[in-house]
Amino acid sequence: MAELNVEIVAVDRNIWSGTAKFLFTRTTVGEIGILPRHIPLVAQLVDDAMVRVEREGEKDLRIAVDGGFLSVTEEGVSILAESAEFESEIDEAAAKQDSESDDPRIAARGRARLRAVGAID
């Protein structure tokens, strides 16, 4: 079975790199699912994106991503984000509080974090 090489990088750290069978996220033009051998593209991620990486025989990775870009090439998928957090790193109560902020950037980040922990769609 063909695999998808994935690299997710935030400004402050490398988040994850490895192989996947499918990747799902939201861009400014809509939701996108990427399988191996997807056509090349570059897209801007929404400010409250959640990236789901499906891996063969392992639990899906759910990562809250605050803005950034997605690039798909023949070599795989690269996501360059302003910030990113694994589901396991997220404090759900703090994320809920952030999602209710009057500051749109903080609220977007809170929503992304809530999506990553499965608290909202």
Curated annotation (Swiss-Prot):
Q: Name the predominant localization.
A: membrane
Which biological process terms from the Gene Ontology are attached to this UniProt entry?
proton motive force-driven ATP synthesis
What membrane topology was assigned to this protein in its record? Peripheral membrane protein
InterPro entries, alphabetically? ATP_synth_F1_dsu/esu, ATP_synth_F1_dsu/esu_N, ATPsynth_dsu/esu_N
The record's listing under SUPFAM superfamilies reads: Epsilon subunit of F1F0-ATP synthase N-terminal domain
The UniProt keyword set, sorted, is:
ATP synthesis, Cell membrane, CF(1), Hydrogen ion transport, Ion transport, Membrane, Transport
Q: What molecular functions are annotated in GO for this chain?
A: ATP binding; proton-transporting ATP synthase activity, rotational mechanism
Cellular compartment(s) = Cell membrane
Its signal peptide is none
Which is one Gene Ontology cellular component term of this protein? proton-transporting ATP synthase complex
Q: Which Pfam families match?
A: ATP-synt_DE_N
Sequence similarity: Belongs to the ATPase epsilon chain family.
Main role? Produces ATP from ADP in the presence of a proton gradient across the membrane.
The record ties this protein, via NCBIfam families, to: ATP_synt_epsi (TIGR01216), PRK13442.1 (NF009977)
Question: Subunit info?
Answer: F-type ATPases have 2 components, CF(1) - the catalytic core - and CF(0) - the membrane proton channel. CF(1) has five subunits: alpha(3), beta(3), gamma(1), delta(1), epsilon(1). CF(0) has three main subunits: a, b and c.
Q: What else is known?
A: Was identified as a high-confidence drug target.
Q: Name the chain's protein.
A: ATP synthase epsilon chain
Give the species. Mycobacterium tuberculosis (strain ATCC 25618 / H37Rv)
